């Protein structure tokens, strides 16, 4: 039996069940733990290859139904997604909020991202793109603050515009090719057709919105900053894998075509702008969660730039960095959540936490070194590959920008670490800290993620070996022609 469809169907079914368990907190917690375990198992027991929903398959050379493609690269992405989702779900069980609604939305988001990553049907991809956009706003609303409601509403308003433009782009491609299946569609994109150019441009608009690239970076950063820390970890994971999923589709359809050269330049520019804007804005922040939110935007720029290069090395580096990023950034957001349980997120009101939580401080420091690209952590491995990919296509200026942004990231992170853990505070503040408990489930999740930062940093091949074959299939050494 092929369990591939269960990666989408199972979380959707569980989301419906959770929605029926309002007020039954104990049942919600038990079922959530079981669901989290199953989410991690499913990617390992599913078979590689194409899966056709509805039993239609291929008819006269055409795919008449919804199709999904599963391969080692997509397995690496979904395993990472499953791990982050499971840890966030477990952490959320220790928080006082509407647990059934939190789990319902989280599972719907998981199913949507899995569908986006697996989709070989562009309209099916769009449907789940819309769902995950609504889910992200809903998760922010759970924070219950006025700022959270405003951030979620702004995101939904912008999403209505971006998603409508993306749907129009899909309509252009359908009108030009006569099919929605991605594998079939790519064979009809060789012709010189203005509608195809328009469709590509509008897909890039949807990509920028979903991933938080300029001009949508401020809206997305506000979404992360106004959520609870563990929910922010989930949101940024969704965004990075939306970016990867949509970029894979764009590369599969257009990479190597002569008219895609301009799109290469646009996508690289968006990635570089996100890197620079993100780190500059992070350096200006006095709120810790806002600082982390802008770093999430900056790191998304690295991913977009690597994938936009379109070469096998660039694609491997981009996907690898996305996987690394969601791991260390989730660790940082969980660290911020633990700190906020003590005394909020205003950096000027924090300090002196090192003696009270030395193990948490150490794990957060590891995650900060990982995001800064310091060896031997995982962030160094993927950033090094990204710089190599830029050099390979004779773009040393991009590699230099990546290094400068990493330096800015390191400065910002060390400043925050000092203000939170090392800055001296008075005795009254220390007593206030001691009266507030540290969420143990969050510490457990932080430990798992920190361990992964170290393990992948020391043994990067355990991830990259899954990526190379698909990257060689998608990649074209366009700039080396």
Curated annotation (Swiss-Prot):
Keywords tagged on the record: Cell membrane, Membrane, Transmembrane, Transmembrane helix
Membrane topology summary: Multi-pass membrane protein
Membrane spanning residue stretches: 3-23, 33-53, 75-95, 99-119, 122-142, 155-175, 196-216, 241-261, 264-284, 303-323, 351-371, 400-420, 443-463
Major subcellular site: membrane
Alphabetized InterPro entries for the sequence: CPA3_Na-H_Antiporter_D (IPR050586), ND/Mrp_TM (IPR001750)
Pfam assignment, any one: Proton_antipo_M
One GO CC annotation: plasma membrane
Subcellular location: Cell membrane
Protein name per UniProt: Uncharacterized protein MJ1309
Organism the protein comes from: Methanocaldococcus jannaschii (strain ATCC 43067 / DSM 2661 / JAL-1 / JCM 10045 / NBRC 100440) (Methanococcus jannaschii)
Taxonomic lineage from the root: Archaea, Methanobacteriati, Methanobacteriota, Methanomada group, Methanococci
